Curated annotation (Swiss-Prot):
It comes from Ranoidea caerulea. Antibacterial peptide, that adopts an alpha helical conformation which can disrupt bacterial membranes. Each caerin displays a different antimicrobial specificity. Belongs to the frog skin active peptide (FSAP) family. Caerin subfamily. The modification Lysine amide is found at K22. The lineage of its organism: Eukaryota, Metazoa, Chordata, Craniata, Vertebrata. It is found in: Secreted. It comes from the Eukaryota. The keyword Zinc does not apply. This is Caerin-3.3. GO terms for cellular component: extracellular region. Transmembrane segments: none annotated. GO terms for biological process: defense response to bacterium. Expressed by the skin parotoid and/or rostral glands. Keywords: Amidation, Amphibian defense peptide, Antibiotic, Antimicrobial, Secreted.
Amino acid sequence: GLWEKIKEKANELVSGIVEGVK
């Protein structure tokens, strides 16, 4: 569903931010 896609994108963004901080 739409919410699953939103959560998936949010997880990708968080992962990208975490990788950038490392």
